[in-house]
């Protein structure tokens, strides 16, 4: 959330941010409400001052025996009290409206962020891991076909049980997912992260605190009730990312200067309704309704957030470096940055099994596995997370940052395609072998049920 003072003093910067991020918000109404609210607060102060003066004279007038003047003062005091009540009621209504309207304003991008309208104008900063990439089969089988051939991914049964956009990982596929999660957690523990295992349901108030609500209500899974129905602060939703509960751990709290920086990591399943709206990405596990992820959340002093941002990026990249997966780093332009971010980098892993329009020149496609974001004080204001620089100083809002460390299904896609062998097996990355009881190769398993038989082998 932007502060009232910032919006009041820098309306053109806010207007530029609305244009840069393509956000539709009524800034003129916000400024109008803020001005009227301040006028009413000033009028309220005047009325309280006048009423106190009048009230203080009532006793003196009665003591002096001037009953008519005393009665007139009493009536004047009551009139001032009534007017003050009306002014305060109107001011309260305006303040509530102003708070709602401020939630519709996005974070102002950093001045050095690339300016652009869409992902086409994101800036590739560098590539890693391509100089010594492994030899691939002449024709790489896409993960969704290979996963079914090896019987480690089951899309049909996932859809049968839960609907489209859900899947089963099985056998070595399930072990590989578990291995990835444990490997990622170990990597980030080495980087100084403390583990948090968060609750899966989160309140609407928590979703507002991190900026998912009110803008992205339609993408969330509501626990009871329709998404388009009104909701209260306490209504529960399935978490779309562990960023929500971990950031809101400290909502409405004041941390001490000695506490900072706080670095938490959290594994969780994540739930999003948006899957299935992106063409060819609906095949396989690139874009699904439920997926596993390790999230990194940082709470820092304002003066440290720029440096910590680059440190967080390196910490997320470490996972891909140790898996020996080629990837690239993009800096997001203003139009593709997101509602809450001041600055954002994406890490995209190379998956060679499916060619994409505008994809890498060597074929295949890029898959986003992490977004590393600096929110500055935007989330901290929404969730009212503060810190006290010194014990006797005023508290101020800290800065929050987060990044995925990283999304599991898309890394699984990259492994199945990049570590694929000519014989249709998959080599287990060396870094994951200790997490799979030393297994070095995924060869698949025997399929179960009549559906695994050819038509000629089935009984009538």
From Swiss-Prot:
**Reaction catalysed by this chain?**
tRNA(Ser) + L-serine + ATP = L-seryl-tRNA(Ser) + AMP + diphosphate + H(+); tRNA(Sec) + L-serine + ATP = L-seryl-tRNA(Sec) + AMP + diphosphate + H(+)
Q: Where is the composition biased (Acidic residues)?
A: 109-121
**One Pfam entry name:** tRNA-synt_2b
Query: Where is it located?
Result: Cytoplasm
Q: Which residues cross the membrane?
A: none
Which InterPro entries has this protein been placed in? aa-tRNA-synt_IIb, aa-tRNA-synth_II, aa-tRNA-synth_II/BPL/LPL, Ser-tRNA-ligase_type_1, Ser-tRNA-synth_1_N, SerRS_1_N_sf, SerRS_core, tRNA-bd_arm
User: What are the Basic and acidic residues biased-composition ranges?
Assistant: 50-65
Give binding positions for ATP.
272-274, 288, 368-371
Positions binding L-serine in this chain are 241-243, 295, 404
Kindly tell me the pathway this chain contributes to: Aminoacyl-tRNA biosynthesis; selenocysteinyl-tRNA(Sec) biosynthesis; L-seryl-tRNA(Sec) from L-serine and tRNA(Sec): step 1/1
**Predominant subcellular localization, coarse grouping:** cytoplasm
Query: Which keywords does the record carry?
Result: Aminoacyl-tRNA synthetase, ATP-binding, Cytoplasm, Ligase, Nucleotide-binding, Protein biosynthesis
Task: Note the CDD domains from the entry.
Answer: SerRS_core (cd00770)
Q: Name one GO molecular function term.
A: ATP binding
UniProt KW Ribonucleoprotein keyword? no
Instruction: Choose one Gene Ontology CC annotation of this protein and give it.
Output: cytoplasm
Q: What is known of its domains?
A: Consists of two distinct domains, a catalytic core and a N-terminal extension that is involved in tRNA binding.
Q: What function does the entry list?
A: Catalyzes the attachment of serine to tRNA(Ser). Is also able to aminoacylate tRNA(Sec) with serine, to form the misacylated tRNA L-seryl-tRNA(Sec), which will be further converted into selenocysteinyl-tRNA(Sec).
- Describe, as the record does, how this protein assembles with itself and its partners: Homodimer. The tRNA molecule binds across the dimer.
What family is this? Belongs to the class-II aminoacyl-tRNA synthetase family. Type-1 seryl-tRNA synthetase subfamily.
Please state what the protein is called: Serine--tRNA ligase
Q: Which gene encodes it?
A: serS
């Amino acid at each position: 959330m932007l502060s009232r003072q910032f919006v009041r003093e820098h309306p053109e910067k806010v207007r530029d941010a609305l244009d840069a991020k393509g956000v539709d918000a009524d800034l003129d109404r916000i400024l109008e409400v803020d001005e009227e609210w301040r006028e009413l607060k000033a009028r309220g102060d005047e009325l309280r001052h006048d009423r106190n003066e009048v009230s203080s004279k009532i006793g003196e007038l009665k003591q002096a025996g001037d009953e008519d003047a005393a009665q007139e003062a009493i009536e004047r005091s009551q009139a001032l009290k009534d007017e003050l009540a009306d002014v305060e009621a109107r001011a309260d209504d305006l303040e509530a409206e102003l708070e709602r309207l401020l939630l519709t304003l996005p974070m102002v991008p950093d001045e050095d962020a690339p300016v652009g309208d869409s992902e086409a104008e994101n800036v590739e900063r560098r590539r890693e891991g391509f100089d010594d990439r492994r030899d691939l089969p002449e024709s790489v089988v896409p993960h969704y076909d290979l996963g079914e051939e090896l019987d480690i991914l089951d899309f049909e049964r996932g859809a049968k049980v839960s609907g489209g956009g859900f899947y089963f990982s099985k056998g070595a596929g399930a072990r590989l997912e578990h291995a990835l999660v444990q490997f990622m957690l170990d990597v980030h523990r080495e980087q100084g992260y403390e583990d948090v295992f968060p609750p899966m349901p989160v309140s609407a108030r928590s979703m507002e605190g991190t900026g998912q609500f009110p803008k992205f209500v339609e993408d969330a899974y509501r626990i009871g009730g329709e998404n388009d129905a009104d909701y209260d602060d306490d209504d529960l939703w399935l978490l779309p990312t562990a960023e929500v509960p971990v950031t809101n751990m400290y909502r409405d709290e004041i941390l001490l200067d000695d506490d900072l920086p706080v670095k938490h990591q959290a594994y969780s399943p994540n739930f999003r309704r948006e899957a299935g709206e992106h063409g060819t990405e609906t095949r396989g596990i690139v874009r699904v309704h439920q997926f596993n992820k390790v999230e990194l959340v940082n709470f820092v002093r304002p003066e440290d957030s720029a440096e910590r941002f680059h440190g967080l990026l390196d910490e997320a990249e470490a996972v891909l470096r140790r898996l020996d997966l080629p990837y690239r780093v993009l800096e997001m332009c203003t139009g593709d940055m997101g509602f809450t971010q001041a600055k954002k980098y994406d890490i995209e892993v190379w998956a060679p099994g499916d060619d994409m329009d505008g994809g890498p020149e060597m074929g295949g496609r890029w898959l986003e596995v992490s977004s590393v974001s600096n929110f500055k004080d935007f989330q901290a204001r929404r969730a009212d997370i503060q810190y006290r620089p010194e014990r006797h100083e005023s508290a101020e809002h800290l800065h929050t940052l987060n990044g995925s460390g990283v999304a599991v299904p898309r890394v699984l896609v990259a492994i199945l395609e990049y570590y694929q062998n000519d014989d249709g097996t998959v080599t287990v990355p060396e870094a994951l072998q200790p997490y799979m009881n030393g297994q070095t190769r995924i060869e698949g398993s025997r399929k179960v049920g009549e559906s695994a038989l050819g038509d000629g082998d089935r009984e009538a």
